[in-house]
Amino acid sequence: MQARYSVSDPNALGVVPYLSEQNYYRAAGSYGGMASPMGVYSGHPEQYGAGMGRSYAPYHHQPAAPKDLVKPPYSYIALITMAIQNAPEKKITLNGIYQFIMDRFPFYRENKQGWQNSIRHNLSLNECFVKVPRDDKKPGKGSYWTLDPDSYNMFENGSFLRRRRRFKKKDVPKDKEERAHLKEPPPASAKGAPTGTPVADGPKEAEKKVVVKSEAASPALPVITKVETLSPEGALQASPRSSASTPAGSPDGSLPEHHAAAPNGLPGFSVETIMTLRTSPPGGDLSPAAARAGLVVPPLALPYAAAPPAAYAQPCAQGLEAAGSAGYQCSMRAMSLYTGAERPAHVCVPPALDEALSDHPSGPGSPLGALNLAAGQEGALGASGHHHQHHSHLHPQAPPPAPQPPPAPQPATQATSWYLNHGGDLSHLPGHTFATQQQTFPNVREMFNSHRLGLDNSTLGESQVSNASCQLPYRATPSLYRHAAPYSYDCTKY
């Protein structure tokens, strides 16, 4: 504006200060040439403003009025119920209902004859409204209207927008019976506590019977029944029973059951047993040492916890005593593919399990050694001295075998090395981690450094791992399943 006016009238800048806008516009208004356009433009707003103000003045109040005059979303029954409930004695006359509705909702201030007629119809036609005769003490005209005591729950959650159903007096006995049925169970359970316990004991006894039948049907697999419907209380009740019937409760008593699994021809290795072993912690609550070490086992894993020892013990026993021990090497190394391969990196093993392993290095006190699971995995990974130590403990009647395993497993391990190269990558690590079972990796860098050191110092691996010949085929063969290990680089590069 300033530049435009200064160009059209350069004398204005000489008279008026440049930045004082009030003086500028006051001075600019004094010029004749400027006054005519200013007058035109200033006159038009006045003209249009006055004209619009006069012509549209009645309409300014109309948009506000329809907002007040919108019909409320309440039914006539809801309006009458509101009026009755807001009355001091929960009863109100017909005129009181009219007045309440008009005071609350301005929409009903007009067309009174129409909606008041509807109010009277609803009062007389609906059974939820009861007419109360007027007392003689209170002078006035008309009777009082009140709500039927059984119709107070007519609206859902106290909202007048929704009514459940049309209230009828003949439905009141049915409603009372339904309420009585709904109210009966809590006092019945409180009063009849002794009667409720046999009902609760019924399913538990049935579940126990199922477990007993499974024991009688297959003595080699005591508690392998999949009782998914076990409640936590039932599982806790069945836990002493399962620990008593499970032969893995004591290492010496586990021998006859483990060897009895062989004549049945049960497969020692299957996908189901692997997935069961992976989902449920090995060992369970069967050993008190596990509870001391802080192993947290869900109670529903109890029926599964006893099955893996009997399944894996058969190839474990065959691997030491029978000549064809290739099945043992395959099964135990394949088992390490799922459970043992992640252990050197301490990625998937919970810390409580590592503490349990470090607290019980070897011998009868180890909960996993008693179940013949973790010891077999670690032995299959390369710590064969530790492995034989466990098996000399688990088979006291057999003479302790030589430190070097029989030469028969080597072709089998070479044949299975195409998918177990990561076992070869890790085969020297158990010598450092599980043979002593006291060393842990504080960070990832030390883990990889120890891995390289173990590769360079092969003599150290041979001294601590008494089966160095098993490591060579795994170390030389490239891996197909590199992602199965926590680290995926090929050890032949280093």
Swiss-Prot record:
Covalent link Glycyl lysine isopeptide (Lys-Gly) (interchain with G-Cter in SUMO2), residues: K183, K213
Biased composition (Pro residues): 397-410
GO terms for biological process, alphabetical: anatomical structure morphogenesis; apoptotic process involved in outflow tract morphogenesis; artery morphogenesis; blood vessel development; blood vessel diameter maintenance; blood vessel remodeling; branching involved in blood vessel morphogenesis; camera-type eye development
Biased composition, class Basic and acidic residues, residue ranges: 170-184, 202-212
Keywords: Activator, Developmental protein, DNA-binding, Isopeptide bond, Methylation, Nucleus, Phosphoprotein, Transcription, Transcription regulation, Ubl conjugation
Source domain of life: Eukaryota
InterPro entries noted in UniProt: Fork_head_dom, FOX_domain-containing, FOXC1/C2-like_FH, TF_fork_head_CS_1, TF_fork_head_CS_2, WH-like_DNA-bd_sf, WH_DNA-bd_sf
Region described as Disordered: spans on this chain: 166-213, 233-267, 380-422
Subcellular location: Nucleus
Residue ranges of the annotated DNA-binding region, renumbered to this chain: 71-165
Biased composition, class Polar residues, residue ranges: 239-248
Positions of modified residues (Phosphoserine): S214, S218, S231, S239, S250, S280, S287, S366
Modified residues (Phosphothreonine): T246
Compositionally biased residues, Basic residues: 385-394
Record keyword Transcription present: yes
Single Gene Ontology MF annotation: RNA polymerase II transcription regulatory region sequence-specific DNA binding
Entries under PROSITE patterns matching the protein: FORK_HEAD_1, FORK_HEAD_2, FORK_HEAD_3
PTM (free text): Phosphorylation regulates FOXC2 transcriptional activity by promoting its recruitment to chromatin.
GO cellular component, one term: nucleus
Presence of keyword GTP-binding: no
Main function: Transcriptional activator.
Protein name: Forkhead box protein C2
